[in-house]
Amino acid sequence: MTDYNLTHLKQLEAESIHIIREVAAEFERPVMLYSIGKDSSVMLHLARKAFFPGKPPFPLMHVDTTWKFQDMITFRDQQAAKFGLDLIVHINEDGVRQGIGPFTHGSAKHTDVMKTESLKQALNKYKFDAAFGGARRDEEKSRAKERVYSFRDSNHRWDPKNQRPELWNLYNGKINKGESIRVFPLSNWTELDIWQYIYLENIELVPLYFSAKRPVVERDGTMIMVDDDRMPLKPGETPMMKDVRFRTLGCYPLTGAIESTATTLPEIIQEMLLTTSSERQGRVIDHDQAGSMEQKKREGYF
């Protein structure tokens, strides 16, 4: 008998496809959370592979804070149209009416109202019982201890001290009425794995991941791109054109750019091989307080 050996990327791919198919078969109303970033793009690619030549048997859902980069929204709509996907876009209209925003109310309040509460609204509205997310364990310490099947109570809260064991590739999806799970098919991937897979599979991405001259201002050691005229400039503050790109994407006022000349996937991968910092250092929301990500997840965040 000939041994059949998979590369580590093909092993990760097979594991993720298995998880996606398992959830589609086991739950009544799954949904794939689509944040438009590189991890979401890989997860969507895996979902399309899992059910090819058919379409994924669940919709995509984007929780729109109204503060995403303009390039992200354009890319989102292009991808949905290109692949004929069922796309749900949910906005917390109560937050919009209150004028909640990162500049007027701060990152913590903005994230809570326009992301966490908005997500919970959407999950309740459409009665989804399983939601795929693109989080990875190497991103941040609270995500490192979260299971692939992450159970949430009827209020969508996560209890890190009450997680089910996951042995090998066996997942327990039994839930009580009103409960739900968040599912993370990319849990065991690293940032470098993601970039190598994108290169291998020729996956399309938002242009913001590639270096270009962009208008930025530096605030508290973070380079923030001026994406539209809603961003108030401080006295004496003038946007400077710099060669920058983004390792992670979110709301533009809360996402820091990095100086880079990497304009191609091989150049980005080369940068990843040399970097010693986390991609989430550019996320302002992660610096709100000690353990802020775990607290957000306990409250129902992605």
From Swiss-Prot:
Pfam name, any one: PAPS_reduct
Name used for this protein in its record: Sulfate adenylyltransferase subunit 2
Keyword list, A-Z: ATP-binding, Nucleotide-binding, Nucleotidyltransferase, Transferase
Reaction catalysis annotation: sulfate + ATP + H(+) = adenosine 5'-phosphosulfate + diphosphate
Enzyme superclass (EC): transferase
Organism encoding this protein: Hahella chejuensis (strain KCTC 2396)
Subunit structure: Heterodimer composed of CysD, the smaller subunit, and CysN.
Role description: With CysN forms the ATP sulfurylase (ATPS) that catalyzes the adenylation of sulfate producing adenosine 5'-phosphosulfate (APS) and diphosphate, the first enzymatic step in sulfur assimilation pathway. APS synthesis involves the formation of a high-energy phosphoric-sulfuric acid anhydride bond driven by GTP hydrolysis by CysN coupled to ATP hydrolysis by CysD.
The EC number(s) this enzyme carries: 2.7.7.4
Family indicated by similarity: Belongs to the PAPS reductase family. CysD subfamily.
Gene: cysD
UniProt key word Transferase: yes
GO BP annotation list: hydrogen sulfide biosynthetic process; sulfate assimilation
